[in-house]
């Protein structure tokens, strides 16, 4: 069933690279199998593939709204930042969003501008890691990037043992006029979603936890869609494969993370005969099998993160029609706060 035949003017792209160097050692890192302080790229040909894929992205005949994700920390790699500056300078790139721990923004953001990048086309998803950096230091780095012209969102996950810290961070962001996104932290190993979400989202098991989480959410509609999508997306309409695509480090292209996990590959960015283009329709009913591990396509992620949840990534469920039809578009694949 397809319900919308409007042509896409822009494409949303979630490009996951295998850059693995990081300056943090978070004990809960989902990429713990490969994260390292010793090398920049996971494989010998990773950087070459990265260059070729980004070259192909500049040739796509559509505007691209892109989250370019690393498994490590993007700010530690000079060559990654140089390429980011080069890539975002192209006319068909609406913005590039980087997922960062923010610790090096004041020292390294200049590399992007030195290589042709306009910071007003740079978006930063700055996640606070409370075990690795002091809150005020983190906020000073975020403030620097915000004042320099980048679109910045502070991000944090609410767990029972972090909720007090998250609330403190939320208050300080409000005082500074910074955007903040608070997502529910998921339980390791998965589990079925029940009526109250308690089997999936630990913060909802805590007395008053639901109220505290909802008080900080930037968009209640998105939060509720998040919890639904983690359980089932049966019957939900989505723009995955219409105007949203995932690109992996080896060039594979899929409609979204869950569908690519099921083997629905649309092409490969390393194939010169393939062109990334919108689907015939914007929306179609989701066909994700809830029994498929949604990260099964990504062997770099730890085994205990291979959860059998249909749709848990915000990049993916953010393209459900129930969200897309009500959202204010921003230069981010994760921010829906207006």
Q: Across the structure, where does each feature detected by a protein language model lie?
A:
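Canonical Radical SAM [4Fe-4S] cluster-binding loop centered on the CxxxCxxC motif
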Residues: 2-48
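Flexible mid-to-C-terminal extensions adjoining Fe-S/redox cofactors in radical SAM and related proteins
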Residues: 1-8, 12, 32, 36, ...
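Radical SAM/AdoMet-radical enzyme domain recognition
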Residues: 51-69, 77-173, 179
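Short, cysteine/histidine-rich loop/knuckle motifs that typically chelate Zn2+
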Residues: 28-29, 240, 285
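Residues immediately within or flanking Cys/His clusters that coordinate Zn2+
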Residues: 19, 23, 235, 283
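Conserved, mostly hydrophobic/aromatic
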Residues: 26, 98, 251
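Radical SAM enzyme [4Fe-4S]-AdoMet core and its adjacent flexible, acidic
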Residues: 125-250, 254, 264
């Amino acid at each position: 069933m397809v319900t919308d035949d409007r042509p896409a003017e822009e494409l949303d792209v979630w490009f996951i690279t295998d850059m693995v160097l990081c300056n943090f050692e978070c004990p809960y890192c989902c990429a713990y199998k490969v994260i390292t302080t010793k090398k920049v790229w996971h494989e010998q040909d990773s950087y070459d593939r990265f260059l070729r894929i980004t070259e192909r992205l500049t040739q796509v005949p559509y505007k691209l709204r892109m989250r370019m994700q690393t498994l490590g920390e993007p700010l530690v790699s000079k060559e990654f930042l140089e390429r980011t500056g080069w890539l975002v300078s192209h006319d068909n790139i609406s913005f590039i969003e980087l997922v960062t721990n923010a610790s090096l923004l004041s020292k390294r953001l200049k590399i992007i501008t030195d290589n042709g990048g306009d910071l007003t086309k740079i978006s930063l998803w700055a996640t606070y890691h409370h075990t690795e950096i002091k809150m005020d230091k983190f906020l000073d780095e975020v403030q620097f990037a915000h004042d320099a012209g980048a679109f910045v969102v502070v991000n944090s996950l609410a767990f029972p043992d972090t909720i007090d810290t998250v609330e403190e961070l939320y208050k300080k962001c409000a005082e500074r006029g910074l955007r903040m996104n608070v997502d529910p932290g998921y339980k390791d190993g998965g589990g079925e979603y029940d009526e109250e979400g308690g089997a999936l989202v630990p913060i909802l098991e805590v007395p008053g936890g639901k109220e505290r989480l909802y008080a900080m959410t930037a968009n209640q509609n998105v939060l509720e869609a998040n919890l639904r999508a983690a359980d089932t997306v049966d019957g939900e309409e989505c723009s995955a494969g219409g105007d949203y695509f995932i690109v992996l480090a080896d060039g594979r292209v899929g409609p979204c993370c869950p569908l690519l996990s099921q083997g629905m590959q649309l092409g490969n960015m390393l194939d010169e005969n393939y062109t990334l283009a919108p689907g015939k329709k914007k929306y179609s009913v989701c066909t994700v099998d809830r029994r498929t591990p949604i990260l099964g396509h990504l062997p770099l992620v730890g085994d205990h993160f291979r959860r059998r949840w249909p749709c848990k990534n915000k990049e993916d469920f953010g393209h459900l029609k129930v969200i897309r039809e009500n959202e204010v578009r921003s230069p981010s694949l994760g921010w829906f706060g207006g």
